[in-house]
Amino acid sequence: MLLLSLTLSLVLLGSSWGCGIPAIKPALSFSQRIVNGENAVLGSWPWQVSLQDSSGFHFCGGSLISQSWVVTAAHCNVSPGRHFVVLGEYDRSSNAEPLQVLSVSRAITHPSWNSTTMNNDVTLLKLASPAQYTTRISPVCLASSNEALTEGLTCVTTGWGRLSGVGNVTPAHLQQVALPLVTVNQCRQYWGSSITDSMICAGGAGASSCQGDSGGPLVCQKGNTWVLIGIVSWGTKNCNVRAPAVYTRVSKFSTWINQVIAYN
């Protein structure tokens, strides 16, 4: 079996909660908006972030990686003071959920981010006050720089993005979808030279991420631990479920992420 150019080892961030182990276990059908996804189990993806403006409009996802840091996509253009990190959300139509709404003190975008090529599409958000871990809020593990993943491994992406490439219908409940990973070479067969070594591709098998999922997680399970291997970045405008979606390859940025956290 081919290997994606990336050994799955973990960078532990956080407190005694550790990382990547939800208190509430996810339930996956692996059968098939996200597009062609399904409702997640309440609280089963505790690192999922909703990025919102002051009106409560959800515009991007993100992943909690420690009590003070969230990782998202650079193209989400998060502005401290104008945008907020919302933790613990599941049903966006509910006003009764135990949410944590946190201000952003700093948004640190990778210095080589290119909005034309979408290369290096990653931003770190420092929270103005630390998140409080609960059964519904805890961090994900980061893939390390020497990550290796087998082709065809099924991973999961989550979010509240559009349910279809047509129209603007978004779900109330957090969606999840299992997606197979594809190699860089396979992805380049569809996207050509747009795919760089700093990207990872998944999907093309009847399901996809879509607009509004941007910045959110692509996670794979190792044993009982979930590891963040991708950040939702880009794909077809109509969210074609037969085309692989493109994610920022977290392993290429784990050293930079840890350096930013250490010095800020």
Swiss-Prot record:
It is an enzyme of class 3 (hydrolase). It comes from the Eukaryota. Glycans are attached at N114. Residues 34-262 form the Peptidase S1 domain. GO terms for molecular function: serine-type endopeptidase activity; serine-type peptidase activity. Pfam families: Trypsin. PROSITE patterns: TRYPSIN_DOM, TRYPSIN_HIS, TRYPSIN_SER. GO terms for cellular component: extracellular space. Disulfide bonds join C19-C141, C60-C76, C155-C220, C187-C201, C210-C239. Its EC number is 3.4.21.-. The active site is at H75 (charge relay system), D121 (charge relay system), S214 (charge relay system). PANTHER family: CHYMOTRYPSIN-LIKE PROTEASE CTRL-1, CHYMOTRYPSIN-RELATED. Belongs to the peptidase S1 family. This is Chymotrypsin-like protease CTRL-1. It comes from Homo sapiens (Human).
